[in-house]
Regions:
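Substrate-binding/active-site clefts of carbohydrate-active enzymes
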Residues: 1-180, 197-213
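Noncatalytic carbohydrate-binding groove/subsite architecture in carbohydrate-active enzymes
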Residues: 223
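Acidic-and-aromatic substrate-binding clefts and catalytic sites of carbohydrate-active enzymes
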Residues: 191-197
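Short, surface-exposed connector motifs at secondary-structure boundaries
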Residues: 180-186
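Glycine-rich nucleotide phosphate-binding loop and flanking beta-alpha elements
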Residues: 63, 185, 193
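Hydrophobic faces of well-ordered beta-strands that scaffold small-molecule active sites
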Residues: 55-57, 185, 214-215, 220, ...
Length: 228
């Protein structure tokens, strides 16, 4: 639901901006023309509630995509006028304040490594000074703590949810959806977040938001039993 960026994105698990609804939901024709994704989603919530239908949002706390994140590491801006992001190089506008000047002249593999370095310091430089992402490899073992720190896929870069600023930002962004009227969350890849972090940083905050907005909220996490 949030703004995504990925050459393989079809399911919405590659956030590049947790604070806004993906531009592919924006209005394009008739009376909806010019409406933002946020406005269209609000109308959907209102229409569903008018018919007694609940809206459960699939959310991600564990990772971003590999194109940075608008507030944590703004590697790109998204051309809001291009709905189809299959041609990722067309709809993504590089931010050369952080990306190398020759980024677009590099091949795909080199571009990926340049993006990843800004989030995980994989080139040996301290780009991620605030530790917003975990700086470990892509491999992980379901039975070891690496499942909480390792990157689960090339397209999903593991957020450092042990950094309070990351947790606060995510909670702030998802509070917006509660205010809009979303009735519950299905929390993706919760099994890849350390239980102590999940149970102390996220669950109490979401419960408090449910009380704040005078409504019970459904929290459900995704887990996968070993062996993976």
């Amino acid at each position: 639901m949030v703004q995504n960026a990925s050459g393989y994105d079809y399911h919405g698990y590659h956030a590049m901006d947790f604070s806004k609804v993906d531009c592919r939901y924006q209005g394009i024709t008739g009376e909806d023309a010019g409406k933002t994704g946020d406005e269209m989603f609000q109308e959907l919530i209102n229409a569903a509630h008018a018919k007694g239908i609940k809206i459960i949002l699939d959310i991600v706390l564990n990772h971003t995509g590999n194109f940075g994140e608008a507030k944590l590491m703004p590697e790109f801006s998204r051309d809001q006028d291009i709905r189809n992001q299959a041609a990722i190089d067309v709809c993504m506008q590089p931010n050369y304040d952080v990306l190398p000047s020759g980024y677009l002249e590099e091949n795909g593999a080199a571009q990926y490594q340049a993006r990843l370095a800004l989030m995980k310091n994989t080139d040996g430089q301290n780009h991620d000074k605030n530790n917003y992402w975990h700086h470990v490899g892509n491999s992980w073992n379901w039975d070891e703590p690496t499942r909480w720190w390792g990157q689960i896929a090339g397209d999903c870069v593991n957020l450092n949810t042990e950094t309070p600023a990351v947790d606060e930002y995510l909670i702030q962004c998802y509070e917006k959806f509660i205010k809009m009227g979303v009735d519950g969350f299905r929390i993706d890849t919760s099994g890849h977040i350390a239980p102590l972090t999940f149970n102390t940083a996220f669950i109490p905050e979401f419960k408090a938001l449910g009380v704040k907005y005078a409504s019970k909220r459904l929290l459900a996490g995704q887990t996968t039993p070993a062996p993976f």
